[in-house]
Amino acid sequence: MSEKVNSDFEDFSSDEETDQHNVLIQTKKKISSKDDIFSKKVEDIESENESDIEEEQKQEEKEDVEQPDKENGEKLDREVEEQASSTTSLDLKTEKLRQLVKSKAAKKSKHKTGVVYFSSIPPYMKPAKMRQILTRFGEVDRLFLKKEDDQKYKQRVKGGGNKKNKYEEGWAEFIRKRDAKLCAETLNGNIIGGKKGTFYHDDILNVKYLPGFKWADLTEQIARENDIRQAKLEMEISQANKLNAEFIRNVEQSKMIQNIKNSRKRAGKEGESADSHPHREFKQRRVETSRANAPSDIKQQSSGSKDLGNVLTNLL
């Protein structure tokens, strides 16, 4: 039947109709292909969106993981920078100290040093003030002031004196010898001077230049004095320990004797009297003598007379 319909259609249709029919069929096919392409594009877009979403999620996870790492890294960087800054400051300080030491050593090598001695220091004068006074005459390298003894300090404070530190004597080293000589000549036996009304204006210093004396000699002397002081302290401590040990031994002995007496008192008076006045017995010999005027009862008889008497008694 279909074949017949087609044949009939072919008989009554013209060429133009057939061409239009073919075009319509082709357009339907083309439309169907466009729909397919659109659906494919939509699917591609959805897949791309899904992939983009997945990538964004992954990136967010990575960022979440990397954020604490970055924070830790920043903290570590800050700590490293702080340590570096502290080390740099310490290095700068050490370098400055080295430069100062080198400069002082260079000055000492160029010039011969001189040492002056102060037999008395004005009351309550500090080393900083003394250095300020001495720098008028030249550059001062080292300064040493000796404090008073602890015993003197305690007595002074106990008597109502000032509680400030007091120095008895001192030494100062000038980088140039001529400055030390000038200081000794000008300050010895004279007032310190300066502005009127200052605390140390009218104090007199006794300064002496020590020829041929170096700072090493002073350090040796101080070390020797410290050794002597330490030896005296050790001797005093050993004597005190001996006295303490003897005192403890005497106390223990007295306690022991007291305990013995108490035990005897508890035992009774008889036992106490017997123990306190013991009765001793001694073997007594007969008194004999060979003197002619001695009484007959104590007169010593000779051995011959004794034998004769025995013989006569036997015979009778």
Swiss-Prot record:
Quaternary state and interactors: Component of the 90S pre-ribosomes. Interacts directly with DBP8.
Lineage: Eukaryota, Fungi, Dikarya, Ascomycota, Saccharomycotina
GO cellular component annotations of the record: cytoplasm; nucleolus; small-subunit processome
UniProt region (Disordered), positions on chain: 1-91, 261-316
Function noted in UniProt: Involved in the small subunit (SSU) processome assembly and function, and in the 18S rRNA synthesis. Required for the early cleavages at sites A0, A1 and A2. Stimulates DBP8 RNA helicase ATPase activity.
Gene (name only): ESF2
Localization per record: Nucleus, Nucleolus
Polar residues: compositionally biased ranges: 290-316
Family: Belongs to the ESF2/ABP1 family.
Gene3D superfamilies: 3.30.70.330
Superkingdom as given in the UniProt entry: Eukaryota
Spans traversing the lipid bilayer: none
Organism (species): Saccharomyces cerevisiae (strain ATCC 204508 / S288c) (Baker's yeast)
Zinc-finger in keyword set: no
Residue stretches of biased makeup (Basic and acidic residues): 32-44, 59-78, 268-289
GO MF entry, a single one: ATPase activator activity
Modified residues (Phosphoserine): 7, 13-14
Other noteworthy facts: Present with 12800 molecules/cell in log phase SD medium.
Domain RRM span(s) in chain numbering: 114-204
CDD domains according to UniProt: RRM_ABT1_like
InterPro entries cross-referenced by the UniProt entry: ABT1/Esf2, ABT1/ESF2_RRM, Nucleotide-bd_a/b_plait_sf, RBD_domain_sf
Keywords attached to this entry: Nucleus, Phosphoprotein, Ribosome biogenesis, RNA-binding, rRNA processing
Acidic residues bias spans: 8-18, 45-58
Any single GO BP term: small-subunit processome assembly
Protein name: Pre-rRNA-processing protein ESF2
